[in-house]
Amino acid sequence: NDGATILNLLDIVHPAAKTLVDIAKAQDDEVGDGTTSVCLLAGELLKESKYFIEEGMHPQIITKGYKEALKLALQFLHENAHSVADKNETEKREMLIKCAQTSLNSKLLAHYKEFFSELVVQAVETLETNLLDKDLIGIKMVTGGSVTDSFLVSGVAFKKTFSYAGFEQQPKKFNNPKICLLNIELELKAEKENAEIRIENPDDYKSIVDAEWELIYEKLRKIVESGANIVLSKLPIGDLATQYFADRNIFCAGRVDAEDMKRVQKSTGAIVQTTVNGLTEDVLGTCNQFEEVQIGAERYNLFKDCPHSKSATIILRGGAEQFIAEAERSLNDAIMIVRRCMKANKIVPGGGA
């Protein structure tokens, strides 16, 4: 039921229709909701202007008239806007919840609007008021359970990545851990296709293999010496590294999604490293608590109460995947609306108010 999603999936050729798609996309990016409304409004304006075009009126005159109408409409909206800045925290929060409920009214989650509007407002309130960075709110979909089993994590959460043998021995909970973020592979690599090594005797081959092992062990030693308790990498962390870290009570995860990595980086203050040379405590991040928990049929890594930048993750539960995907789009719209209200500190009652 998301206007922007429907329009994006349509195979449109007509130039005027493409303009409507662009309008919906701009509305979705800037405001996050009202994509259907803006398309209906634009369509009606085009419909009304058709009569004047047929009468021979120049398009520039029509455009000028619409610009004047825009000024009057904006003036009217500003005059009728209600400020929420002068209200106390309780009243302001109630207003934000009502805004979230209005957004959810026309969506799939309308039946659960009281529950999810509270969740959305909590998520936006978690962010730092001066920034309200929407990228710091994540929504993770977990199939199974009831919709009302959804909950908010005050921090970053993402699904456990593929793990090699040895991860079972790794610790699953830390308080105030030091977090190392990498963009390097930590595994023994197979030879490239058509690679060729010419050796005179077996000792030469042994020295090549030993050198390769020494290289990866050197990388692992430097990471351990930095004092890191948690190691995350965008690239694979192999079974050798996994077991090496497990022996030293270090948690590791490879192939972490770029978006999740970015949120961990912003929240914990860690700096992504492309080499282990010069790896010091200064580039490590931290959070109040890290733990790996079971949610439904999946394992999730939770970074709670990150001090560097406040963040939040909504764990969205539900039966069918299609239902959860639609619910995610609905929540995104509600989050954008609440965020917009907090930034502008003004709201305008709708026609049904």
From Swiss-Prot:
GO function term, MF aspect, one: unfolded protein binding
A Pfam family per the record: Cpn60_TCP1
Subunit (UniProt): Heterooligomeric complex of about 850 to 900 kDa that forms two stacked rings, 12 to 16 nm in diameter.
GO cellular component: cytoplasm
Protein location: Cytoplasm
Family stated for the protein in its record: Belongs to the TCP-1 chaperonin family.
InterPro entries: Chaperone_TCP-1, Chaperonin_TCP-1_CS, Cpn60/GroEL/TCP-1, GroEL-like_apical_dom_sf, GROEL-like_equatorial_sf, TCP-1-like_intermed_sf
Organism: Tetrahymena thermophila
Function noted in UniProt: Molecular chaperone; assists the folding of proteins upon ATP hydrolysis. Known to play a role, in vitro, in the folding of actin and tubulin.
Major location category of this protein: cytoplasm
Key words of the record: ATP-binding, Chaperone, Cytoplasm, Nucleotide-binding
Name the record gives this protein: T-complex protein 1 subunit eta
